[in-house]
């Protein structure tokens, strides 16, 4: 796809042509991608991450875009980026969906809703009544999906403009590892661009939990009931995210970390670290703080 083909019909001036294979944010490590940039800092970040093929930006930033990149100019690059992406999704640019494949040993119970296209269900999986599987969802062997769970939906990726709020259509996939259990009413979102949201093997996703777009979760990790994992987080293996905890976007929670129930995580958490509170701090510090408050009030 050429940059001009992607931008056709929109108020965008293509000044330098390029071939693109995907759209993506500057932080997303995808080769051949079109990015938007509203500042010189974002342009530098895109160059540092690599894989950029073309840049959609404002006219006054054009001279900061190297000759090796395609260049498109718009008054509102951010909005045009979203509009271009959403149209390409609707036109099937990110790939035609294949007929769904369900292993003969899998059990899809009556009342489950499985898209006729874009689904792969592995051996011995169990899909309960009321579960919903949207396109581009891949289940490895022995996965269990309990009633009311929704897999492969759009995550919460919305951009606000002066006159509108526009959702970014999700064009990636969701992959769930072997023997993982997704409990009742949990929601697992697919990725936004040509990437995957990945849940490892032997994980447990609790009742009513929400795992947003582009999240990566390692093996044997437990996401507690009602927990929220915001977009682009990386959660390691053998991690526990307690019930009702919230992990804000783009954080890394390393292997064996423990986030206690109801905590709000605003920073990365190291391997084996235990954090508590709103906002979450090392657990021992939180306990000391509570003891000090209690001693003052007694």
Regions found by a protein language model. Give the residues of each.
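Structural signal for interior beta-strand "rungs" in well-ordered beta-sheet cores
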Residues: 36, 97, 101-282
């Amino acid at each position: 796809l050429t940059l001009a083909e992607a931008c056709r019909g929109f108020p965008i001036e293509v000044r330098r042509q390029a071939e693109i294979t995907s759209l993506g944010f500057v932080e997303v490590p995808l080769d051949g991608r079109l990015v938007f940039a509203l500042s010189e800092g974002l342009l530098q970040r895109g160059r540092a991450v690599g894989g950029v093929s073309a840049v959609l930006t404002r006219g006054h930033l054009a001279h900061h875009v190297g000759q090796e990149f395609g260049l498109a100019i718009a008054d509102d690059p951010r909005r045009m980026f979203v509009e271009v992406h959403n149209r390409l999704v609707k036109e099937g640019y990110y790939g035609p969906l294949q007929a769904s494949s369900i292993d003969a040993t899998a059990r899809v119970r009556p009342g489950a809703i499985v898209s006729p296209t874009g689904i792969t269900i592995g051996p011995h999986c169990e899909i309960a009544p009321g579960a919903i599987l949207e396109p581009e969802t891949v289940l490895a062997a022995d996965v269990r999906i309990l009633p009311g769970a929704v897999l492969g939906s759009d995550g919460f990726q919305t951009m606000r403009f002066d006159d509108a709020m526009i959702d970014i259509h999700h064009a990636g996939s969701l992959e769930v590892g072997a023997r993982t259990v997704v409990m009742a009413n949990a929601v697992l979102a697919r990725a936004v661009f040509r990437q995957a949201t990945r849940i490892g093997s032997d994980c447990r996703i609790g009742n009513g939990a929400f795992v947003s777009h582009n999240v990566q979760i390692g093996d044997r990790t437990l996401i507690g009931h009602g927990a929220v994992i915001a977009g682009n987080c990386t959660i390691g293996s053998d991690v526990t995210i307690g019930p009702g905890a919230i992990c804000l976007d783009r954080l890394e929670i390393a292997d064996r970390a423990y986030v206690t129930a109801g905590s709000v995580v605003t920073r990365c958490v190291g391997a084996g670290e235990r954090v508590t509170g709103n906002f979450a701090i090392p657990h021992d510090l939180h306990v000391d703080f509570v003891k000090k408050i209690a001693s003052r009030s007694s």
